Amino acid sequence: MSNYIFDHRDPYEWSKRTASSSLPPLIVCVAITGGVHGKEANPNLPETPVEQVAQTFDCYRAGASMVHIHARDPKNWATGTGDPGAFYEINAMIREKCPDIILNLTTGGSYGQPFEERIRCLDAKPETASLNLGPEMYKSRLKARKAPLPNPREEMLLNDCSCTTYEEITTLAKMMKDRGIRPEMELFHPGHYWVINDLISQALVEKPYKIQLVLGSITASYATPWNLMSLIQELPANSVFSVAGMGPFQLPMAMMAIILGGHVRVGMEDNVYSKKGELLQSNATAVERIIRLARDMNRDIATPSQAREILGLSSTPSSY
């Protein structure tokens, strides 16, 4: 087990590491696209593979060690796809420009996708992939997608549920284990710890357990300092946690993760604004900002090699 792993529940361990500037280097994951909103929300959001690869490269140069990928449907860039060929193409193009960045694919997919469609991306050979721990409900208004954007549509109210059963979660965890894919368990509220502990008891996930605390989305925990601290107190031993704050909560939740020795996810999937009323110019803008703030707070930034060690991934990047 890496020396970077420590018990985040122990305030004395945190104090000792903070006083000696020995918190683990910060893994910065960038979620470049997402599976819900698109260029109608921010014209700078990458949808096509070429756009995704270009922005990933800029984020990699800025210091991101992991990229979280949603592939879009080339017949309708406004929607997601589970086609493993689409994911494989993106993976291969990114690997050519970013030789050691960690490739993290979504199995959460996009609204309206059944389980069978969402898991097809595993055929694209990711190094790690998201593993949702329960159903998600959506209720949000998507802006009208107007020409000259491709695939225009009217404003729509998204009122949907991404259903996930215990059996499906177990099946997906087993698939990942059999293929050597490290699951990133997406925890939206405290009840999901029941599922995590069930997976641990079945030996379907391996140490260190990568757990992403998602706060601020509908039906997830409210994005407050108190809720985040409570979630950290319930982490299993030998865990690595990252924090994904949604919308305006992205920056404050990321700052707390930096302080507490966790890791961060930023990017346009979760927040298309740099501040109120000001759209992000690129995903790299979000990466550059969080790295600047982390360094000001004496957190080193993890290289892809260090991130692989922290997460228990192979030191040899995947090839395509």
Regions found by a protein language model. Give the residues of each.
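N-terminal small/glycine-rich loop or linker at the start of catalytic domains
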Residues: T18-N44, R145-L149
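Active-site mouth loops of central-metabolism enzymes
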Residues: I32-A54, T106-P114, L158-C163, E184-E186, ...
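Active-site beta->alpha loop and helix N-cap motifs at the rims of alpha/beta catalytic domains
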Residues: T81-C163
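Alpha-helix-loop-beta-strand connector modules within alpha/beta enzyme cores
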Residues: A78-L105, L172, M176-D178, S230-N238, ...
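C-terminal helical cap(s) of enzyme catalytic domains, especially alpha/beta-barrels
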Residues: R141-P150, K276-R299
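Glycine-rich, proline-tolerant flexible connector loops at the mouths of alpha/beta enzymes
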Residues: E40, S65-Y88, V214-L215, V272-K276
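Catalytic alpha/beta core domains of metabolic enzymes, predominantly
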Residues: S130-E269, L280
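Conserved, mostly hydrophobic/aromatic
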Residues: Q52, C59, H70, A129, ...
